[in-house]
Design a protein with these regions (language model features):
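Glycine-rich beta-strand-turn "strand-cap" elements at beta-sheet edges
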Residues: 2, 40-49, 76-107
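Short, well-ordered beta-strand segments in beta-rich or mixed alpha/beta enzyme
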Residues: 2-9, 38-67
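Generic alpha-helical hydrophobic packing signal
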Residues: 3-5, 15-17, 77
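Short, surface-exposed ligand-recognition loops at beta-strand->loop->(often short) alpha-helix junctions
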Residues: 9-22
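Intrinsically disordered, low-complexity acidic/polar segments
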Residues: 15-17, 50, 62-64, 97-100
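Short intrinsically disordered coil segments
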Residues: 23, 71, 103-107
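An amphipathic, aromatic/His-enriched active-site/gating alpha helix that lines ligand/cofactor pockets
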Residues: 24-25, 29-37, 56-90
Length: 107
């Protein structure tokens, strides 16, 4: 399993609007993507204009396809609500109780 994280800082007072946009526009797009598994959106309790979206993918290739084919349009959709460009990072999932993945142990 593979993840993409997208860290954002919204313009003042735009966090709720971004959350609504993600729920109404972004999630339906994600759900149609090959290999998409799940999306978790976190909002900072101390900095309410900061958020982190974590998407889970079956494979790195699925996430890369989404990044190339769909993410540019989504980035344009959310850009007016942001203070800065989103920061995208990718990770292999090592352990997850939700997705029933356990770290492999060396023999």
């Amino acid at each position: 399993m593979f993840t993409r994280t997208v860290e954002v800082t919204t313009k003042s007072g735009k966090a709720q609007e971004l959350t609504t946009l993600i729920n109404d526009k972004v999630l339906p797009i994600l759900k149609k993507q090959t290999g998409f598994v799940d999306e978790t959106v976190l909002v900072s309790d101390t900095e309410p204009n900061r958020g982190l979206a974590i998407s889970f993918w079956n494979t790195k290739q699925d996430a890369e396809r989404y990044q190339k084919e769909q993410y540019p349009a989504i980035q344009e959709m959310i850009r007016p609500l942001l203070d800065a460009e989103p920061v995208v990072r990718t990770f292999n999932v090592d352990t997850s109780t939700t997705h029933k993945i356990a770290a492999t142990k060396a023999a």
